[in-house]
């Protein structure tokens, strides 16, 4: 099938960007979305044009490296998946797809669809860890923890820091990311001792990075 793309192109955060139109044909419905972009880039390179920059690594929805807006939706139309898990069977012949990077002050554009998410790293460095009794790792079953607690902690630990929550939030808040990291440590015995100081330190860093405030309005 034939797919029309409108992609945000920007050389860096210091220069203005613009949307550029591309056509990819043929596109197999069995391709992943990123494989379709690979095909586009192969064509651009063959024509001695600059390929579209985008992040990816595992391409299995695990690492959190990939991510951009697909028709204004973080990671695209399929719920609970990353953009690398999106497949072209989700689209139809002649569809026009608009691709943009995460839009947030705290995520400056590096190039095209690639943004700098190191602000997340600095939030973790501010307190997203345990520094108490970490000299020797105990056996996993040495500390008994209720299964329900473990499940809740694992749900929070499953956050892959992709940045989609920031992109989806009108205030560009990273409170969902920060709270996930706070929760997965605070729920477990190892993280109890520093839980209060951890929250304050991580939220202070969150605000210092320029993320917006969370709102329930």
Q: Predicted regions span which residues?
A:
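Short, structured protein-protein interaction patches enriched in aromatics and acidic/basic residues
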Residues: 53-65
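Ferredoxin-type iron-sulfur electron-transfer modules in oxidoreductases and energy-metabolism complexes
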Residues: 31-50, 95-217
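Glycine-rich phosphate/adenylate-binding loop and adjacent beta-alpha elements
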Residues: 70-92, 99
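Short, contiguous acidic and Ser/Thr-rich linear segments
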Residues: 20-32
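Long, hydrophobic/aromatic-enriched structural stretches that serve as scaffold segments
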Residues: 49-50, 65, 69
């Amino acid at each position: 099938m034939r797919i029309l793309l409108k992609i945000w192109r920007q050389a860096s955060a210091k220069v203005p960007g613009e949307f550029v139109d591309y056509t990819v044909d043929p596109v197999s419905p069995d391709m992943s979305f990123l494989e379709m972009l690979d095909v586009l880039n192969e064509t651009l390179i063959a024509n001695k044009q600059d390929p579209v920059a985008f992040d990816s690594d595992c391409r299995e929805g695990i690492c959190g490296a990939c991510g951009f807006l697909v028709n204004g939706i973080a990671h695209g139309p399929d719920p609970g998946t990353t953009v690398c898990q999106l497949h072209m069977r989700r689209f139809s012949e002649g569809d026009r797809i608009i691709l943009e990077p995460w839009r947030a002050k705290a995520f400056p554009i590096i190039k095209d669809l690639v943004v700098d998410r190191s602000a997340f790293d600095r939030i973790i460095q501010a307190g997203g860890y345990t520094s108490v009794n970490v000299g020797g790792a105990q056996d996993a079953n040495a500390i008994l923890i209720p299964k329900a607690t473990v499940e809740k902690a694992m749900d929070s630990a499953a956050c892959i820091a992709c940045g989609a929550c920031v992109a989806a939030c009108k205030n560009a808040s990273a409170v969902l990311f920060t709270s996930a990291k706070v929760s997965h440590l605070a729920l477990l015995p190892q993280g109890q001792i520093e839980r209060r100081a951890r929250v304050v330190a991580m939220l202070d860093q969150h605000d210092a990075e320029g993320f917006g405030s969370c709102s329930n309005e």
